[in-house]
Amino acid sequence: SSWKEMCELWTSDLRTHITEKRWHKAKKQLGASLKRHNISNGFGKSYLQSGKYDSLAEAVGQYGDAMVEIDNDGILLRISTNKIQMNLNLRRGMTIQKLAFASHDMVPCIGTLPHGYFSCISLGADYYSGGVVIELPIERRRITDLEQVNPHFLLKNNGDIQIHTIITSPVGEIIKSIEISSSNESISLNYHFSKWSEINGSIRLGNITLLNDFSQEGVKVLCSNGGIDEECFILNNEVQQIASPSTLVSSFGGLGATTGDISIANKHKKLRLSWEPSECSVMPLLQFSPSNSRALSRVFFSMTEMDDTKKYSANMGSFSLSISTGIEN
């Protein structure tokens, strides 16, 4: 039956007890099953839209329902609507400097924490949001998207604004776009990896650094881990899912989040992070590091991790992350 075949193709033996011959046989069986059920085996799509893209100079000023501004140094790009205020750092790969929603009284909930924010030496770094980090432990290399970018803008038919850029890295192009809703408290971060080489390491993207009330002890993280109901995790102790236990294993573990939703809530406010698992089955990772009266609170999304059973993919695919308050018109 179809259910039996699905379970056979989902067996952990194809990951932990595998030979080259059996691996190719399983791939052939999977291809035949997809064809029989008329399911495409295509993986990864570009989130860029057709239409005329405008340059930064053309977009500055009133752009649709938004106001687009650039600072005197040409570094910080500010996009403002009635419901959203967002600053992007064009010198650091279009990472999010700060993001605020109207229902949060425009107090930033996500953004960048600069070096020196924490007095603890172990946390002495810049912590960005919306970036890509590729760790290659065997090569002892780290690749990021923190490069100077030249964004282009598209005003969609529904009034939403898309900002996109292409970043060249040693392993391939990172095609990155950010879409701002004109009607809801929602943005989306979209990533597409074109013609990438094989990665012997980890790829973490859509990295979120929480600010203000969302970065304090007692914040709740809610998600489903295979069941119907959400599980609730209260951040009050050190959490380091991003840490690497050895050079052969890149992470201790992560969240299941099987529905493609994570909610982050404090006493009065809520954030919703959502994605489509059928398009990209990322693994969310949490980091919570208390430091005196402050805390570093971050959520990462892993497209691939590394251990001694890793199989390489010829296509890295795409990922789209929606960030919202869950409030819609």
Predicted regions and their residues:
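A short, sequence-level motif marking secondary-structure junctions
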Residues: 90-95, 115, 179-184, 277-281
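Histidine-centered catalytic/metal-binding microenvironments
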Residues: 1-97, 103-126
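Extended, charge-rich low-complexity regions and/or helical-solenoid scaffolds
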Residues: 83, 115-156, 177, 206-237, ...
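Broad, structure-driven detector of short, well-ordered beta-strand segments within folded domains
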Residues: 77, 83-92, 174-180, 271-275
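Extended, loop-rich substrate-binding clefts of extracytoplasmic carbohydrate-active enzymes
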Residues: 128-196, 290-295
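A short, compositionally biased
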Residues: 71-75, 91-95, 158-159, 227, ...
